[in-house]
Amino acid sequence: MALKTYKEILADIDTFLFDVDGVFTDNRVLLYAGLDPVRTFHSRDAYAVQHAVKEGVRIVVITGGRSAGVAEAFGRLGVTEFHHSVPDKSAKLDELIRVTEAHNSFI
């Protein structure tokens, strides 16, 4: 029995779940008086998320933060499942896994 190629393995995955800080960012946060903390994203990550959504992949973002800018950015990329202000991301992940039979990849 031959091992599956990475493309064959990826074909079975229909959902990706991500955190924000340290996954889409490099952990730097810019602080300006009177503004929400500013995080920087790489344009290649944005392209990959947008492309995945267009291909029908379910993208879920779970974050402990509450940034209107981050939520808006993911919304522009087509992400419809954005969970912010989550104090226990592990519990939220378990909840999401229970309510779906998706083949998940955890990053």
Task: Describe each model-derived feature in a short phrase.
Residues 38-55, 87-99:
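Short, acidic loop-to-helix structural element flanking the phosphoryl-transfer center
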Residues 1-20:
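Non-catalytic pre-domain segments flanking phosphatase-related domains
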Residues 15, 69-107:
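C-terminal cap/substrate-recognition subdomain and adjoining C-terminal extension
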Residues 15, 20, 28-29, 74:
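A metal-dependent, Asp-based hydrolase signature
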Residues 31-34, 45:
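A short acidic/small-residue loop/turn micro-motif
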Residues 49-73, 84:
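Substrate-recognition element of Asp-dependent hydrolases with the DxDx(T/V) motif
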Residues 1, 36-39, 83-85:
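Short, flexible loop segments at the rims of nucleotide/cofactor-binding pockets, characterized by
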